[in-house]
Amino acid sequence: MSDITAAQTTLQQAQHIVFMTGAGVSTPSGIPDYRSKNGLYTEHHNAEYYLSHAFLAEHPLEFYQYLQSNLYYPDAQPNVIHQKMAALTQQGRASVITQNIDNLYGVAKTAQLVEFHGNLYQVYCTKCGQHVDWHEYLKSPYHQTDHGYLRPNVVLYDEGIASANIERAVQYLQQADLVVICGTSFRVYPFAGLIDYRNPKAQVLAINAEPLQLPFAFTMVQQDAVDFFEGVQV
């Protein structure tokens, strides 16, 4: 049995899986990642500033235009990675903690989901607090009702993670018998720090085309994630 087949078998047999995922899960769906050679941070100088609370506060229209031009991919669809993970959550065997804000796990009907950094497609008015359909947001950054400024419910640089998301993520990890890291370099905190709350008996797998260097014991599965999940039976 190959290492990859063994890892797929481990995944199929586990009963309390936690998937910890990042932008690499959505690149097969046509959404660019952030830190690769062709990623947003490489292509755009000062991208972290453009995605900060400071830029939003100082230049709200430019912030809106930047998000609209660079982060929204409304025609993107879930790929086999999202689909297999979602199927496992629907069976009650898994949960997903993701850094992704692209809503593809929601489209895939993921049952147990923590969108740690929020969701671009959940938009609200900063004046009245009302939720607004994202289609309206892509037409205008101002609320038709009270002309308040609209923004997506995502965590910008200089903003904190919602405590409810932290609590749910920790709860999932404490119950895990298997943690699967996929599509992330696992260097962004506090997301990467969540691993410290895992069940001490949980096995950790990392699925990535390139080897990862992580400061804890784990099994490296060096394979493209699409190929890996195509071989997973759910």
Swiss-Prot record:
Q: Which CDD domains match?
A: SIR2H
Where located?
Cytoplasm
Residues annotated for NAD(+) binding in this entry: 23, 27, 35, 99, 101-102, 117, 184-185, 208, 226
The catalytic activity of this protein is classed by the Enzyme Commission as 2.3.1.286
Instruction: Report the protein's function.
Output: NAD-dependent protein deacetylase which modulates the activities of several enzymes which are inactive in their acetylated form.
Q: Provide the family line.
A: Belongs to the sirtuin family. Class U subfamily.
- Protein name per Swiss-Prot or TrEMBL: NAD-dependent protein deacetylase
Gene symbol? cobB
* Deacetylase sirtuin-type domain sequence ranges: 1-234
Q: Which PROSITE patterns match?
A: SIRTUIN
Q: Which GO terms describe its cellular component?
A: cytoplasm
Its Gene Ontology molecular function terms?
histone deacetylase activity, NAD-dependent; NAD+ binding
NCBIfam families, per the entry: PRK00481.1-1 (NF001752)
Residues of the active site are 117
Q: Which UniProt keywords apply?
A: Cytoplasm, NAD, Transferase
The cross-references to PANTHER family, in alphabetical order and at most eight, read:
NAD-DEPENDENT PROTEIN DEACYLASE, NAD-DEPENDENT PROTEIN DEACYLASE SIRTUIN-5, MITOCHONDRIAL-RELATED
Catalytic activity, reaction form: N(6)-acetyl-L-lysyl-[protein] + NAD(+) + H2O = 2''-O-acetyl-ADP-D-ribose + nicotinamide + L-lysyl-[protein]
Enzyme class name: transferase
Q: Which positions bind nicotinamide?
A: 101-102
InterPro entries from the UniProt entry:
DHS-like_NAD/FAD-binding_dom (IPR029035), NAD-dep_sirtuin_deacylases (IPR050134), Sirtuin (IPR003000), Sirtuin_cat_small_dom_sf (IPR026591), Sirtuin_class_U (IPR028628), Ssirtuin_cat_dom (IPR026590)
